[in-house]
Amino acid sequence: MAAARYWKLVPRGRGLSQNAAAKASATAPEVRDLEVVATPVARYPPIVASMTADSKAARQRRVQRWQATVHAAPSVDEKIRILTKMQFKKYVVHPQISALNADRWYQSFTKTVFVSGLPPAPALSPPPPSLDLAALRAAVCDCILQEQVYVRRRRPRSLFDRRQALASSILDQVVRTLVNLLAPLNPVLSTAALDCKRSVDFYWLRGEERIPAGHRKGHIDALRYQINDKPHNQIRISKQLPEFVPLDYSIPTEIPVMKCKPDKLPLFRRQYENSIFTGSKTADPCCYGHTQFHLIPDRLKRERLIRQNQAEQVEAVFRANAIASLFAWTGAQAMYQGFWSEADVTRPFVSQAVITDGKYFSFFCYQLNTLALTVQADQNNPRKNLCWGSQSQPLYETVEDNDVKGFDDGTLLQIVHFLLNKPREDGAQLLASQEKELDLGP
């Protein structure tokens, strides 16, 4: 039986015949692996996805180029302009909303954990100064009685207008009076900026959705949110309030997870100018928040909710207002310092809030620990924003015969303690103040 035959292809060099090439190949020395010379690096540019293609790689490259543009922005104003210039439909978040359990939805939107009770005072905080409680109580009672007379003279057209005008004027006068009286005890208040009904806006991205219809059907798009808040009064200072807990403080409480879209709250989408605003321009030296004062509208007051068999929603209204308003305020402060979702904060941002319906007051403290709320930035981000809050308590019961009945000193003291909170002094300033106190001692 004949043996099987096969053909072997022999490479032929240029200018050689086939027989000559075969002889040259047979006589050539063997080349081992260690003698192979490394091939030079390719000099052509890397192959990347097209900027205009309809693919995941192309979309990722466009996002990376946009992020690089934000990182390279020369100023904070330019960075905010780039982050807010593209207008898409976004969910408009109202801090004062009548939806049931809105506070749980707002915790999910802002990655905030709510902690019942107020945080303890910082360990290195100085002892509280001695207060003349009787003088403070008399000043607040005078404000209440004075505004009662003025509102009665104006004679609003309806009972609703009268109650809103009375609560608004009382809150305005009480805040101004207490700030002036406490300025000698807290020098920060003497140089602070006191705003009245100033806008506070914040725009951010949180979560994703699949577009159900249209020419972009099936695409994955980010969920966008916008808060347009208007606190009744707010105090801005030039230095930052001290943190309540460390930046990476771990809390075991979980954030509520909402499996429905925000439309079910309900929240509605609108397309208009994106805005990030703390109440002042970026060049303002008073760029940090101290305390906000919010007035609950008449449609959300506890008497109306109790009549509608929604007594459990009374405190939820206060919590939702605090979470949304303080997140927007502290988030805007952080972005004024150059932080955003892809450049997360390196220090906490702290602010306080007092929320009232004219008679009942509730107190909240907020610490912003992260702005990385997008799906990509939040993948390995253990930080959570924290909100502490108290139950609402009355400042007074009623006004009868030009006398304030049932005045609660505890509520007044809590307002005073909020206003006396001040930035932490550095080591040199703290040592100088202690030496001054020793020199002025008995």
Swiss-Prot record:
One of its GO terms (biological process) is mitochondrial translation. GO terms for cellular component: mitochondrial inner membrane; mitochondrial large ribosomal subunit; mitochondrion. Pfam families: PDCD9. GO terms for molecular function: structural constituent of ribosome. Keywords: Mitochondrion, Ribonucleoprotein, Ribosomal protein. Disulfide bonds: none annotated. Component of the mitochondrial ribosome small subunit (28S) which comprises a 12S rRNA and about 30 distinct proteins. Belongs to the mitochondrion-specific ribosomal protein mL65 family. This is Large ribosomal subunit protein mL65.
